[in-house]
Amino acid sequence: KIEVMQVSVVENEYEQRAHFEKQYPLSENVQYRFMKSCAGYCVATYVLGIGDRHPSNLMVTSDGRFLHIDFGHFLGNFKTKFGYKRETAPFVLVTQFVAVFGGEESEEFKQFENLCIEAFNVLRANFTLLCSLFTLMISSGLPELRGYDDLKWLYEKLCPEKSDEQAAEIMRELIQESLRNERTRANLFAHL
């Protein structure tokens, strides 16, 4: 069963956690599954440049899996509204999500950060494979993947020339940038 997770910019992180616990009885397994899938979501949407990230496209399963639907915009082809880029954060990560797995000072947040770093470095280690797979899809007719120039996004995001330690620091900065992004809050509010 998949449901829309209502996120309100008015609610504080404790109210959001209470809502989550009411909807999804918060066992350690559910909390851990949410945290792990949120880490996967953050890294995947960043690397693939998934756009149109708003509450109607963010879902939570009854067992705590967090997922994104609607992959119509990718490789950084983000929508604009009235000439403004709607998505300015590397990925959607708000305090309400972090509250579900314990808040920024928790061990679970450190675990989340480490999972993001590990996933990012695994993708970086497989940079050539990813580019090869995307190259095979160029002839598929996808409007946002028409030629080799479209693959620049992957190179820029995966930064294969960096060391794993440098990439870890980049991911930590991306997490903080996403968490502090006020435009994300405004975008979420606009879709309520």
Per-segment meaning from a language model:
Residues 1-40, 55, 59-192:
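ATP-dependent kinase catalytic cores of phosphoinositide-metabolizing enzymes
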Residues 43:
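Conserved short secondary-structure elements within globular domains
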Residues 49, 54-55:
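Canonical protein kinase catalytic loop motif
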